[in-house]
Amino acid sequence: MRTENTATLNLMWGALILEELARLGVQHVCMAPGSRSTPLTLAAAQQTKLKRHLHFDERGLGFMALGLAKASCAPVAIITTSGTAVANLYPAIVEAWLTHVPLIVLSGDRPPELLGCGANQAIVQPAIFANYAQQVNLPTPDAHIAPQMLLTTLDEAVANQTRPVHINCMYREPLYPSEMSGTILDSESPYLRPLQTWLQHAKPYTQYGKSEQLSSPSDDAIMRFVHGKGVIIAGTLTPEQDPQQLIALSQKIGWPLLTDAQSQLRQHPAAIGNIDQLLQHPKARNLLQEADRVLVFGGRLLSKRLIAYLAEQNWHSYWQVLPQQDRLDPSHNAKHIWHANAAQFAQLNWYRSSSANWANTLVTYNDELHSLFVRNIDQGEFGEAQVIRAIANTRPLEQQLFIGNSLPVRLYDMYAPVSCCTATTYTNRGASGIDGLLATACGIAAHQGKPTSLIIGDLSQLHDLNSFAIARSLTSPLVIIILNNDGGNIFNLLPVPNEELRSDYYRLSHGLEFGYAAAMFNLPYNQVDNLADFQSCYHEALDYQGASVIEVSVSQHQASEQIAALNLWVKQS
């Protein structure tokens, strides 16, 4: 084949891939610059059905795609060149696999004759993500390979997929056509003649039915299950599962609803949100130990006390509801797992429990904790928990909240206030890494342009500094709240043998501030050390059409000392 024909066929394959992915539900494509992925890049540049996002760093790009996929509830494509560019996606792919987020990696690659022979920027890319992505290896574009094969390969790999797919795309040079004119997928092309019908409509070449895995108990099984003292636990639930239905379920059965930070219900007035703290409240814990039935929605619970409660209790019946087959119980309890989303399961024909309202006293204990937190956090010294409660109390309607790992998400889980207007809440708690958090929040903010707040620790932000470049491109509010306690101060809560080891090998104080970093990327910046200034800056930032940074300066020991004091008060209640 002449070289010009090679470049044209490369581009045609790239266009077929991007067009079919758009038909399969992809709305966004995230792209990093590189030469070997040129056929994909040029095809994406002409693709009008996809919104394009560009970033120079593949690690941040992968996490941005993760955020876009979380917010859109749809697969997101990622285009990279060959070599370590692909490997830089690994952390985001791991997180996506563990949390069932569909990312589609399109990696440009050298042809077979340039692998393992010292050719530039050539590594073995197939299976680079090991167990964390479904692998598809495409051959180099060849006029003897029917275009239908390419489409059916994509359809089988991507349709109904809830986890990452890696599509490795080998290309021979030349990669750049001599000109870019007209439509890439020209219906007059002899190569595309078998696809005339496909070219005339907008549906995927192969149309798979939805793979529903709904399983549900019989009416008799439900009646027997609710006959006793039970609790309902809302773990990690996505907004599209409509977790609000669990409120009505709890009220109908007459069992308390205990909510995790990631349930979308942590601050709901009709739920028991302070479960982590109630489990160290003597009277509340004694009451909860009377339960012999549990209904768990989702998994990946934050609270170690709640995880321990599930492990230690002698359950007569343990049901767990998951949207797909998974194993999300580190205690390995014997249980019945039902496949359904939360709303589907909550809307079954439930009966009133024979022990309805058995735990109503929990509401009183929950209210006691509310008063304790108002006195000792809201009206106490300035600190991390106070800032998190202020954010949770002042969020406008339709806002999105992304809570960073390590200490921020735990403080929210322990101390978030009750509120009638709560934001859609996101986390990265699959692998719970502190990398890529800003990039993920940028992806969430970019999808629909809703006001978004990110609560992130200083070490997490240092991990993801260059994602400020993504943030500065946003045109809707993203408030980046950096809780700077000068190091990894979650280790203050862990039993490190002595303070010297804690300081030298775990906390890693850095003495850095973020003002110059914000200035480098031309982001509005404020540094605060009191609640009044924070609230003023926060409200102003929510009205700013773009990203801005608020750095909260606190001491290394403020949060850990406050947690210890609150734990003591709760235990003495």
UniProtKB/Swiss-Prot annotation:
The keyword Metal-binding applies. The keyword Mitochondrion does not apply. Gene3D superfamilies: 3.40.50.970, TPP-binding domain (3.40.50.1220). Pathway: Quinol/quinone metabolism; 1,4-dihydroxy-2-naphthoate biosynthesis; 1,4-dihydroxy-2-naphthoate from chorismate: step 2/7; Quinol/quinone metabolism; menaquinone biosynthesis. It is an enzyme of class 2 (transferase). One of its GO terms (biological process) is menaquinone biosynthetic process. Transmembrane segments: none annotated. Binds 1 thiamine pyrophosphate per subunit. GO terms for molecular function: 2-succinyl-5-enolpyruvyl-6-hydroxy-3-cyclohexene-1-carboxylic-acid synthase activity; magnesium ion binding; manganese ion binding; thiamine pyrophosphate binding. Keywords: Magnesium, Manganese, Menaquinone biosynthesis, Metal-binding, Thiamine pyrophosphate, Transferase. InterPro entries: DHS-like_NAD/FAD-binding_dom, MenaQ_synth_MenD, MenD_middle, THDP-binding, Thiamin_PyroP_enz_TPP-bd_dom, TPP_enzyme_TPP-bd. It catalyses: isochorismate + 2-oxoglutarate + H(+) = 5-enolpyruvoyl-6-hydroxy-2-succinyl-cyclohex-3-ene-1-carboxylate + CO2. Its cofactor is Mg(2+); Mn(2+); thiamine diphosphate. Its EC number is 2.2.1.9. Homodimer. Catalyzes the thiamine diphosphate-dependent decarboxylation of 2-oxoglutarate and the subsequent addition of the resulting succinic semialdehyde-thiamine pyrophosphate anion to isochorismate to yield 2-succinyl-5-enolpyruvyl-6-hydroxy-3-cyclohexene-1-carboxylate (SEPHCHC). Belongs to the TPP enzyme family. MenD subfamily. This is 2-succinyl-5-enolpyruvyl-6-hydroxy-3-cyclohexene-1-carboxylate synthase.
